[in-house]
Structure formats: C-alpha cells, structure tokens
C-alpha cells in the first residue's frame, strides 16, 4: 500500500484528537473547574448546574454553522438543521412562558436588554429602573453601563425601614419624569414584584413596561412565582440562572409589531451570526423546564432559600427585608462587624462559594460591601433539600462567627474543618459522574 493510501485511512488528529492531547493546559483548567464544582457548595444566586444533555448540545457541531437571519429567512445556505433547533427553542419558550413571540438569539442578558433599548428608545430618552444599590442591575441604568451613559435614568429605590419597593413612590416618580420605559426586575431583590401595578403606572404616563426576569425566570416557569408576561410590553430573561440552561438571553412579548422591532434590534441591530450551538442548548433546557419535575425543582429552590434564610437568622444574622420569597437573599453583615469582601473570601476558602454584595443604602464601596448575596438554584439542582440547607446555614455562621473574632479576617482551623464538612455533604450529591 502506498503512503498516500495509508495517510488517507489514518484518523486525522484534528478531528479525532482529545482536548487533553491537543491542549493539555486548557484540559487541566477544565478538570480543575470540574473538581471545584464537585466539591464546593455553590451559593452564587446567578449560577446553576446544567444537565449533561445541555453540555452535549452546546459542545456540538452546530458551533460550526453561520446562520445570520431567522429560521426560513437566512443569509447563508445549509441552515436546514439549525433552523430546526432554533424553531424548537422558540416554540418551547413560547409554550413555557405563555408568550406569543420569542427571540432566542441574544448572546447574553446585557445584549437582550440593549436590544429593547435599541427598539424602543432614542439616545437621551428617559427610563426608570431599580437602583443598582437597591438590588437592580448594571443594565438598568448604572452610570458605568451603556444604559446609564446613553439615556437619562430616573432610578427608584426601596424604603429604608423594610427594604421593599414603595409602589406609590414609583408612581410619583413616573409622573414626575414621564419616562418612555419603566423596568421592573433586578439582581438582588428577594421579594415579589407587583407587575400589575407596574403596568398601571406605565400606562398612566404612556411608558412601555419591560420586566427583566433573568433571576427568577425558572421560578416563573415552575409556577412558584407570578409571571410578568401577561402584564409587560416586553419580558427579558437569561437562560441560565434559575432556568438552568446555557448562558444566553431571551426576549418575550405578545405584540407582533413589537416583536418585529425586537427581532430587528437583535439582527442586524446588535448581532451578526447567532450562536447556534448555544441556541440548541437553550432548546434542550427549555424542553427540560417544560417537564413536570421542573415544577418540583422550582418549588424546592424557594423552600430551600427560605430554610437557608431562617437558619442564618437563627444564628443571629440579619437578612435584608427579613427573608426571601424567591431563590436569593442578602445578608447584612454590619451587626457582626464584617465586610462582604472579607466574608466572601473566608467562605470560599471553606468551600462555600458566594459573592459579596451591596445592601440597600450601603456605606461601603462596591468592592468592599456590607453584605453577601446567597442563592439556592445550583445546590438545589444537585439534590440538596431543606435539611441540607439548614446545615449550610450553620456552616456559614460557623465561618463568619470565627472570622469576626479574628483580627486578620481569617480563621484557618475553622475554615479547614468546615471545608471537610462541605466535602462530606457534596460527596452525598455527586455531579457529572
């Protein structure tokens, strides 16, 4: 046999080689991250653990395909199979949330919100959103964000006494500034949103109502949180967080004329070719959320959050607004004499992953903070229940109480002991075996 025949029959390492063979450094980083996820308790409210099916779809050959446009109207040939995937994602999103129209192409939560601005606002227009310091989001008008640079922003906030949104104040503010858009939703607000009242306020001043349900979309899908879709002109959400899918965005609405504006804003307004492998993974996750067991998951997320909040309160910690009705909570560390940055680092050393977070009217800078944000979606996914989250509350209290008594904010013996307890817990609930 000649050499050319041998070459033709030999596997091409470009297609057959493993990641470990092709790039051992990245392979090692991925292996390390898998180990971290397996052996730490994930309490970051915006994170979750996707199914192996979602991982498989996102790592599929659909990453190779360019598909500018929308199903049935592409600027490239060969899109018949990615059209199938995107159509499935669209139809599943519509069914899951009871919306007439859905755009599954946004690459991120920031881009989905930017698309709404592009479709509905002109530079210099006024909109309202919850202040970041009160639990809002960067894309809702923070001065450092595009939304705060290109538009006039009139923030509303929470009351000092109970840290709840004062809807009468929202109405007064709207009447004062006459916004073109009002945003409901945030990244660190643990209580219900009055979508009906927000829509009434928006209608009273001729504004659009946008609800960013990125954090609680999975709870809406699971039927344990009120849906904004019947009330909002447009609803946006990420597909990760409590929805438990790949990282990306989603736009929902019930008005055909607005849907066309949002489609044009995404493509060609903001994006070119969509990430078809991610859209395929979105379809998988949306399909999972349509199954009966997802309702059980969503119910457990909320029950676990309440159990964690009550456990922490039982150990003498203050919870902003007194508790939670969704998947997250803010811990006010000031009564313990602690800062968020120091507390986050100590908990991470103990295997309890969380993030420092500002609390309403926080006197500290954003990289210091007086609080911690804790969430239950990821650890609920791996099987933790109420009893485990009560234990987690005790472990958090153990670490924070120890560092509060230490001059340097470190308690290595306690942190190491808690880390062993964390490992024992996570070993009972393995992932990706």
Swiss-Prot record:
Stored InterPro entries: PyrdxlP-dep_Trfase, PyrdxlP-dep_Trfase_major, PyrdxlP-dep_Trfase_small, Ser_HO-MeTrfase, Ser_HO-MeTrfase-like, Ser_HO-MeTrfase_PLP_BS, SHMT-like_dom
Pfam families, per the entry: SHMT
Compartments reported by the entry: Cytoplasm
The protein's annotated pathway: One-carbon metabolism; tetrahydrofolate interconversion; Amino-acid biosynthesis; glycine biosynthesis; glycine from L-serine: step 1/1
CDD domains cross-referenced by the UniProt entry: SHMT (cd00378)
Reactions this protein catalyses: (6R)-5,10-methylene-5,6,7,8-tetrahydrofolate + glycine + H2O = (6S)-5,6,7,8-tetrahydrofolate + L-serine
UniProt GO BP: glycine biosynthetic process from serine; tetrahydrofolate interconversion
Signal sequence range: none
Keywords recorded for this protein, A-Z: Amino-acid biosynthesis, Cytoplasm, One-carbon metabolism, Pyridoxal phosphate, Transferase
Needed cofactors: pyridoxal 5'-phosphate
Site (Plays an important role in substrate specificity): 240
GO cellular component labels: cytosol
UniProt GO molecular function: glycine hydroxymethyltransferase activity; pyridoxal phosphate binding
Residues found modified as N6-(pyridoxal phosphate)lysine: 241
Keyword Chloroplast: no
PROSITE patterns: SHMT (PS00096)
Entry's transmembrane regions: none
Residues involved in (6S)-5,6,7,8-tetrahydrofolate binding: 132, 136-138
The enzyme's E.C. designation: 2.1.2.1
Function: Catalyzes the reversible interconversion of serine and glycine with tetrahydrofolate (THF) serving as the one-carbon carrier. This reaction serves as the major source of one-carbon groups required for the biosynthesis of purines, thymidylate, methionine, and other important biomolecules. Also exhibits THF-independent aldolase activity toward beta-hydroxyamino acids, producing glycine and aldehydes, via a retro-aldol mechanism.
Homology family: Belongs to the SHMT family.
Stated name of the protein: Serine hydroxymethyltransferase
């Amino acid at each position: 046999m000649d050499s050319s025949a041998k070459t033709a029959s030999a596997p091409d390492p470009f297609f057959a080689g493993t990641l470990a063979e092709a790039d051992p450094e990245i392979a090692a980083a991925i292996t390390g991250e898998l180990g971290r996820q397996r052996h730490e308790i994930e309490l970051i409210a915006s994170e979750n653990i996707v199914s192996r099916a979602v991982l498989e779809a996102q790592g599929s050959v659909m990453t190779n395909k360019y598909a500018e446009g929308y199903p049935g109207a592409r600027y490239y040939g060969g899109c018949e199979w990615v059209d199938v995937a995107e159509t499935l994602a669209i139809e599943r999103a519509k069914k899951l949330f009871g919306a007439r129209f859905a755009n599954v192409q946004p690459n991120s939560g920031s881009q989905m919100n930017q698309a709404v601005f592009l479709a509905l606002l002109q530079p210099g227009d006024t909109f309202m959103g919850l202040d970041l310091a009160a639990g809002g989001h960067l894309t809702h008008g923070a001065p450092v964000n595009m939304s705060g640079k290109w538009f006039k922003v009139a923030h509303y906030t929470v009351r000092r006494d109970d840290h709840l949104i004062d809807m009468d104040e929202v109405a007064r503010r709207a009447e004062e500034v006459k916004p073109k858009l009002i945003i409901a939703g945030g990244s660190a607000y643990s209580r219900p949103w009055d979508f009906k009242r927000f829509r009434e306020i928006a209608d009273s001043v001729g504004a659009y109502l946008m609800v960013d349900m990125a954090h609680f979309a999975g709870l809406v899908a699971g039927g344990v949180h009120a849906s904004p879709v019947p009330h909002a002109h447009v609803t946006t959400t990420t597909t990760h967080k409590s929805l438990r899918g790949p990282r990306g965005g989603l736009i929902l609405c019930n008005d055909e004329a607005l849907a066309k504006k949002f489609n044009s804003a995404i493509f060609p307004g903001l994006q070119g070719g969509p990430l078809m492998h991610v859209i395929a993974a979105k379809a998988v996750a949306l399909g999972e959320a349509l199954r009966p067991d997802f309702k059980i998951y969503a119910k457990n997320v909320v029950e676990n959050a309440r159990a964690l909040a009550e456990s922490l309160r039982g150990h003498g910690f203050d919870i902003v607004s007194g508790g939670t009705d969704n998947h997250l909570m803010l811990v006010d560390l000031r009564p313990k004499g602690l800062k968020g940055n120091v507390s986050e680092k100590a908990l991470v050393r103990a295997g309890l992953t969380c993030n420092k977070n500002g609390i309403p009217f926080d006197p500290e800078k954003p990289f210091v903070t007086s609080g911690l944000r804790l969430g239950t979606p990821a650890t609920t996914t791996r099987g933790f229940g109420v009893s485990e989250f009560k234990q987690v509350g005790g472990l958090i209290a153990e670490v924070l109480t120890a560092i509060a008594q230490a001059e340097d904010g470190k308690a290595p013996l306690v942190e190491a002991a808690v880390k062993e307890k964390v490992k024992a817990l996570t070993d009972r609930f393995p992932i990706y075996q």
